[in-house]
């Protein structure tokens, strides 16, 4: 079949973590096999690692369940983090003034597909 789907996607929206910090973790797994990517993420001491592992495992499950792809042949083809909505807060400061605090969020997307033989 020529139009057979060979990739699966998973995403996490509005994760309470800046996209800049998530990108540092995502850059480590792009282009790797899914087993290697999970091994890398489990030993990466960053707050974004557990979230990215969760999205990656979701993409693997989507590939197996929805498209009948073999998990051992999957590769992380695309992985990116875009900025989500920013939560704007204010911190009281001296003399009745206030400073803004931007609590940034991100949208994380991981695409896995089968290796070309």
Curated annotation (Swiss-Prot):
Keywords: Ribonucleoprotein, Ribosomal protein, RNA-binding, rRNA-binding. Part of the 50S ribosomal subunit. The keyword Ubl conjugation does not apply. PROSITE patterns: RIBOSOMAL_L22. InterPro entries: Ribosomal_uL22 (IPR001063), Ribosomal_uL22_bac/chlpt-type (IPR005727), Ribosomal_uL22_bac/org-type (IPR047867), Ribosomal_uL22_CS (IPR018260), Ribosomal_uL22_sf (IPR036394). This protein binds specifically to 23S rRNA; its binding is stimulated by other ribosomal proteins, e.g. L4, L17, and L20. It is important during the early stages of 50S assembly. It makes multiple contacts with different domains of the 23S rRNA in the assembled 50S subunit and ribosome. It holds the Pfam family Ribosomal_L22. Belongs to the universal ribosomal protein uL22 family. This is Large ribosomal subunit protein uL22. GO terms for biological process: translation. GO terms for cellular component: cytosolic large ribosomal subunit. GO terms for molecular function: rRNA binding; structural constituent of ribosome.
